[in-house]
């Protein structure tokens, strides 16, 4: 089944297949979130040929292979917990409190730091074609007490973070080119220090495209698009696939979908979107971002990306829930060369057709008069590409 999914990922046009939670543990197989966390060996019944069979298939298909891990956590129903209960943050003489059926490992303890590093190191040594890790963290620190810290319990929070950074420093030193996503029950770990170790971050588990317009707008005030993971999912199916995909194209685009649930037209649109995204990625991920219209200020929102030479730009425009016959003004663009001339055309259209009649404007006109980016259509969106002539 997984081999088939890797083939479908290749057909879709994405460059990486990520195997998420559920691939590990044998004594207590990870059939649910109640067990197995901490035992990072492949479940033999699920993966009789190991991760290597999947990395080989991904390589054959020309797709990178990524893997989900949550190394800071442990389920009480696991071999790790049975063998090293003293490695777990738990209050003595108190009932344990579980968040998502799990507890937190004590990363202030050097032995735990070694264990966490060794999991990554062993996976990379055994399966060097692993190209990406999704590093998850789905629980706050509960039952706050360290068996390692002894009388210095007041240092635990700080020493925990320092211990985590020591692990990440070791991973970075040995695998400097290994991309990793930082995820924590959504965006709970989104911070600047994380950028030293992680190539991207997961802003929120809420992937409703309407909510994501607000989330990504706020996120962009602090972090650039190139570290913002944005995926197309099944949340809010009232929003057309075009709307959902266009929202996700404003960050690091991904798809969390069963392709068999898509119509032929929607599948064709997703394939087209990936091609357009790959072509425009340098502008979106490495260009300057301009927030033209805030989603907090009305029924529409628009964001613009301009490359460093002011030659190429991409404008995303969204109509969320416009009012009937709402008055729509032109939106002034930003970041262009006022003396240059730009061609403007709509791309990534729902009919998958090309706009063969681009219009031409001066940068001065686009920034002082603007363009009619919005419509009165509910949950509609458009992407415009600008190229200097």
Task: Locate each region found by the language model.
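Conserved, mostly hydrophobic/aromatic
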Residues: 17, 58, 116, 180, ...
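Flexible loop/turn segments at secondary-structure boundaries
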Residues: 23-30, 72-78, 139-144, 187-192, ...
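C-terminal beta-sandwich/jelly-roll accessory domains of carbohydrate-active enzymes
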Residues: 321-389
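Active-site neighborhood of glycoside hydrolase catalytic domains
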Residues: 46-50, 88-242, 252-257, 261, ...
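Active-site proximal loops enriched in glycine and acidic residues that flank catalytic Cys/His/Asp
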Residues: 21, 67-71, 137, 182-186, ...
